[in-house]
Amino acid sequence: TTTLKITFLPLDPDALMRDLDFDEDARTWAGAIYETIYESDALNKYKDKFEAYKPSYAGDTGYSGPTEPSPGGSGSGSSAESGGSADNTIDISGFTNPRTKNNHDLAAYAIQAWEHGWGYVWGTFGTVLTESMLQYKLEQYPDIGASEAFIREHWLGRRTTDCVGLLKGYGWLNPDTLTIDYNTNGMPDYNADRMYASAKENGTEYSGMDTMPDIVGLGLWKQGHWGVYVGNGYAIEAMGTQYGVVRTKVEGRGWQGWCKIPYIQYDD
């Protein structure tokens, strides 16, 4: 397994302005902005204004359903159904066309993730959670540490994803090797909100939930969260650390919009 590791270094404003070829006036203006923000108490004073936009590393914490963890098994019989026992295989034998990225196979991929009891870890997209990958994610997103014990007990050694990672993992799936190869096949590494916005930017269909057609493989969106519509009123979503990948009824989940994903071919 290859792990992509990205290191973020402290910002050097002078070096950044040199790289961007700022002239003297632009340097003065940018320097004033930088000092105002970073050398004042503004960030601390107004931090509450930004709390709503801070990602929830535990997943869709707005869910009000069952609180028991669902790491595979027969499901709880509630509105959030867990999948089957853990299975790390990816089977594309039932895909309609593995050589394209299409809505029917996206739905089949999502259903398989549910049936195979995939787990949830922020920043993952369907690969098997190894010790090295978990350590990297703990470094990358320290807030995950609050759920480390649960992740180790339930998800280590199993395939994991976050909400929009379920879509990206399908997009990055290599049909020849059955590996999930990061940032391939034209599928961008967007978060949930950015992925939904891309529908408008690329001219694909999107709207509020009252107009949603019954087409499998549609993207479902609400602020900070993503799901895949699989037909008959159901969605598959990587709900959160305590739930993993589950099946839920679309109605009553608070979805704000649907879209045809620009990077998926729709054969209605």
For the regions a protein language model found, what residue spans apply to each?
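Catalytic Cys-His active-site segments of thiol-dependent hydrolases/isopeptidases
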Residues: 222, 228-252
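Surface-exposed intrinsically disordered loops and tails
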Residues: 128-153, 179-211, 266
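N-terminal capping segments
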Residues: 66-73, 77-179, 223-225, 236-238
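Cell-wall glycan-active module
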Residues: 1-97
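Low-complexity, Gly/Ser/Thr/Pro-rich intrinsically disordered linker/tail segments
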Residues: 253-268
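Generic alpha-helical secondary structure signal
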Residues: 24, 44, 101-108, 193
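Short, hydrophobic/aromatic-rich segments at coil-to-beta transitions
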Residues: 212-219
